[in-house]
Regions:
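Extracellular, beta-strand-rich glycan-interacting domains
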Residues: 46-50, 227-243
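Short tryptophan-centered beta-strand motifs in secreted/extracellular beta-sheet-rich domains
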Residues: 49, 109-111, 170-182, 188-192
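Extracellular carbohydrate-recognition regions
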Residues: 2-62
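Extracellular/lumenal carbohydrate-interaction signature centered on repeated Trp-anchored short motifs
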Residues: 96-109, 164-172, 229-232
Length: 243
């Protein structure tokens, strides 16, 4: 993969016109990302939803909750998934997807989302199965408490020092990124909008697994006790990081 410098396709007329963002997956995988994790990553998969929700699985566990496409709001004029969760703090909506693994030692993931109405919590998770082990990582945003947690080696959540605000008065799209190092079984960093936090040395949740090598990302929203909540998921980007 080409991660830096002038690409080998420079000044060559493309043979195929790209019409939708899903079409760039193969191109990105071969040529590398232009701007992911400070230009230090190669894109391996991009999930967007202008062609529908066929690339993901979506569930809602409470009557009245639902997941559907909307263009109000839109992200750069493209539809997003509206994860509508009813007024119940234990009510959850989930959107997730699986894929085949890629042989590498470090990975990153970026979630682009907006949230309207103050949710109880938002979970963004990444699981890799490779080499006979399963590695679980995740970031939790406690919207009502303005907190951030990471999924620790014991399978529970550890708070990250600081105050992290997810505005919910109108649909402002945020970027949440985190990177993990499989080889050293640790987190590397998390980036939430303008917040850059090092998690080097924080161990992943690791367990033996006989499952086929694969990855799985998940977004969960847990509702408010007062009002229905909307999480608008615009895109998910998976990368291999160059370290």
């Amino acid at each position: 993969m080409i991660g830096h410098g002038r690409p080998d396709w420079y000044n060559i007329t493309p043979l195929v016109q790209i019409h939708a963002s899903e079409d760039i997956n193969e191109l990105a995988a071969r040529l590398g990302s232009a701007d992911v994790f400070d230009r230090r990553g190669n894109v391996i998969r991009i999930y967007t939803f202008e062609s529908g929700m066929g690339c993901v699985t979506a569930t809602a566990d409470t009557l009245g909750s639902a997941n559907y496409l909307t263009i109000s709001p839109s992200y750069h004029d493209l539809p997003v998934i509206d994860m509508l969760t009813t007024n119940n703090t234990s009510a959850g909506n989930t959107v997730y997807s699986f894929g085949p693994d890629v042989l590498a030692s470090s990975f990153g993931i970026e979630f682009i989302f907006a949230q309207v109405s103050n949710a109880n919590q938002l979970d963004f998770d990444l699981t890799y199965v490779i080499g006979g082990y399963q590695y679980n990582a995740g970031i939790r945003l406690g919207q009502s408490t303005q907190t951030m947690h990471y999924f620790n080696s014991s399978g529970s959540w550890t708070q990250i020092a600081g105050t992290y605000i997810v505005p919910y008065s109108k649909p402002i799209f945020h970027h949440l990124k985190f990177a993990i190092d499989i080889a050293d079984n640790q987190y590397l960093r998390v980036i939430f909008d303008y917040n850059h936090i090092s998690l080097v040395g924080k161990a992943l949740n690791k367990s033996a697994s006989t499952a086929f090598p694969s990855f799985n990302w998940t977004v969960n929203q847990y509702g408010s006790s007062v009002i229905g909540c909307h999480l608008y998921l615009a895109a998910v980007i998976l990368t291999i990081n160059e370290l």
